[in-house]
Amino acid sequence: MATVHLRIGDLVWGKLGRYPPWPGKVVSPPKDLKKPRGKKCFFVKFFGTEDHAWIKVEQLKPYHPHKEEMIKVNKGKRFQQAVDAVEEYLKKAKGKDQSHSDDKSKSDKGRKAAKPMKIIEEDDEDAFKGGSSDKPASSMEPITKRLKIIEEDTRSTSIQAADSTAINGSITPTDKRIGFLGLGLMGSGVVSNLLKMGHVVTVWNRTAEKCDLFIQEGARLGRTPAEVVSMCDITFSCVSDPKAARDLVLGPSGVLQGIRPGKCYVEMSTVDPETITELSQVITSRGGRFLEAPVSGSQQLSNDGMLVIVAAGDRSVYEDCSSCFQAMGKTSFFIAGEAGNAARMMLILNMVQGSFMATIAEGLTLAQATGQSQQTFLDILCQGQMASTFVDQKCQNILQGNFKPDYYLKHIQKDLRLAISMGDSVNHPTPMAAAANEVYKRAKALDQSDNDMSAVYRAYIH
């Protein structure tokens, strides 16, 4: 492999972990940021985001010689925005150089040539941000995170006003030992980001083979949930449904057997409020501290560290989890009041998302049935008020016949079912969600459970 010679100011392609190569610029690191030990590396600031990281030299390539190659193999809106940001940066840099050259030529007339003076200018921050107020979601770990505390006045929650704190700079990982139970679509990305940001993590999964990759990345292995909890200060759980969440805590060699006074347990699974209440009671009865923190997002957002965390329960546990939430998510909300409030909020959010996805699928199939172009329908939709990355990606995947799971169809149907049940418990009608739920049940009957939620489309064409 050819030696890469780089210096401050060079444009590069940098590869970080499992993410694709991304355009960036070699810059001077902050004075208080230590260089990692071991192999030679450079501090890189990435275009199209506000991210920076130490990148090993073997993971760097000069920008211009590899530009065409990278553009061919990497796709996506965020990637293109990053490349556009590089070109805008180069254009501005060229303009500054030309202006400086013209000024120098004028000043040189009528006198002897002076020695060239080195001009040092600050980085163009707008170029790194993509020159847009609508900042694209990052493919790397964001360095600007926002932790929000939502304190609402509701019948069940008597709280004050909202507080918001921006956290800037690189993440300083907690010195607490972290445990993680469940390495599914969401959990895998979360653990990867915790490790990448320097947390000490012990993992367990029902299918032990899934732990191997994370052991290679530096995680420790726990043989049982009880062992993980006993080894760690804070243990997170992210499993598929209420039964799995209960079994993990109450079953043989379960979490409850490892709980001791002061141990923290964070339930990230999307389950019903009753399950959360039960788990909270049994954990705290052993002297443990409990927080629920379900997440809104998908496998891709989990991999990107861009989840939205909605938490409730023990506020002090929420604060202890600060660096973990920064590593795995772009925003963290704390909903005051009893444990179970975050579950209620998450079920409502997923009810809306699931119903919306079913409606989009219905629109696509109706367009086809009436002789309209589905692609034109999507193009128009994405130029209107409902335009979003979610709509664009899900619809494009449908048109391409790509139903690789980003969020399992069986899980969104489970969330709809739980939300409808929650509505029944307070005598609140949920007719839209009920109708969508029937369509998802039809899709499950067509063997779409383990496909992406967008496979609900197939319920309309069979």
Swiss-Prot record:
InterPro entries with a match to the protein in the record: 6-PGluconate_DH-like_C_sf, 6PGD_dom2, 6PGDH_NADP-bd, GLYR1_PWWP, HIBADH-like_NADP-bd, HIBADH-related_NP60_sf, NAD(P)-bd_dom_sf, PWWP_dom
- Its main localization is nucleus
Annotated stretches, region: Dehydrogenase domain: 169-462
Domain named PWWP is located at 8-66
Region ranges (Disordered): 91-139
Please list the GO biological process terms of this entry.
Answer: transcription elongation-coupled chromatin remodeling
Which UniProt keywords are present, listed alphabetically?
Answer: Chromosome, Nucleus
The family database entries (Pfam families) matched by this protein are listed as: NAD_binding_11 (PF14833), NAD_binding_2 (PF03446), PWWP (PF00855)
Report the domain of life of the source organism. Eukaryota
- Compositional bias annotation for Basic and acidic residues: 91-111
**Localization in the cell:** Nucleus; Chromosome
Residues that bind NAD(+)? 179-193, 270, 414
Keyword Nucleotide-binding attached:
no
Any one annotated GO CC term: nucleus
Q: Which GO terms describe its molecular function?
A: DNA binding; NAD binding; NADP binding; nucleosome binding
Q: What is known of its domains?
A: The A.T hook DNA-binding domain is required for the interaction with MAPK14. The PWWP domain is a H3 reader and strongly binds DNA.
- Family membership: Belongs to the HIBADH-related family. NP60 subfamily.
Subunit and partners:
Homotetramere. Binds to mononucleosomes.
Q: What's this protein's function?
A: May have oxidoreductase activity. Regulates p38 MAP kinase activity by mediating stress activation of mapk14 and specifically regulating mapk14 signaling. Cytokine-like nuclear factor with chromatin gene reader activity involved in chromatin modification and regulation of gene expression. Acts as a nucleosome-destabilizing factor that is recruited to genes during transcriptional activation. Recognizes and binds histone H3 without a preference for specific epigenetic markers and also binds DNA. Interacts with KDM1B and promotes its histone demethylase activity by facilitating the capture of H3 tails, they form a multifunctional enzyme complex that modifies transcribed chromatin and facilitates Pol II transcription through nucleosomes.
Its protein name is Cytokine-like nuclear factor N-PAC
